[in-house]
């Protein structure tokens, strides 16, 4: 089994790291450069930056933040938020990003994923999917894709959309459960497993981590290849090193 990754996520708005619950009630968590440096020192495998209001606010890319982080942090950086064109992908890669995450723009223009992967390779294009359970109790499970920071329903089925994005060349799927985001009640394992089992590319589980066991469950029960978390790391409940040590004790291969 390949080593599983632990990825701290920095949600950024107005130049600050924030964390909310169910995509709202945002709380300040600090300076992005300082926080990224701390996670690098703790042994994070990667860091993900998401400008969570860039698309809905119509703002430009967070190039200055990525340049500052890339000059001080030496692990892979994934960056998303406000990416609308292949030119935006180029600008972020030049600023120091290693992978680019697209979400709302992929739904508005699926060809963007095909074009970006054609030019820069699948390994640097991540498709982020924000999904919310839409099936009633007793019905077969179904999840709908949302965009614009969880504000806009699309009518798309999350599992089918993940399949389509993988067909178009996406190298990874970053899958967030909107129902679990910030709740600390654990990943939506049914959602994570449904998508992980449906696509041939790695799936990063996101949304709901409340403790170290949740990280292990995302890998073992959700079939994810990587786990992403924010609150438990930002507010000092656990370090990345503690998370890796726990995973290793659980028999999950990690890079120590």
Curated annotation (Swiss-Prot):
Which pathway does it serve? Amino-acid biosynthesis; L-histidine biosynthesis; L-histidine from 5-phospho-alpha-D-ribose 1-diphosphate: step 5/9
> Which superkingdom, per the lineage?
Bacteria
In terms of CDD domains, this protein maps to: HisF (cd04731)
Instruction: Name the principal localization, coarsely classed.
Output: cytoplasm
Which cellular component terms (GO) are annotated to the entry?
Answer: cytoplasm
Annotated active site: 11, 130
Please give the family membership noted in the entry: Belongs to the HisA/HisF family.
Q: What is the annotated quaternary arrangement, including any partners? A: Heterodimer of HisH and HisF.
Entry protein name:
Imidazole glycerol phosphate synthase subunit HisF
This protein's species is Cupriavidus metallidurans (strain ATCC 43123 / DSM 2839 / NBRC 102507 / CH34)
Q: Tell me what gene encodes this.
A: hisF
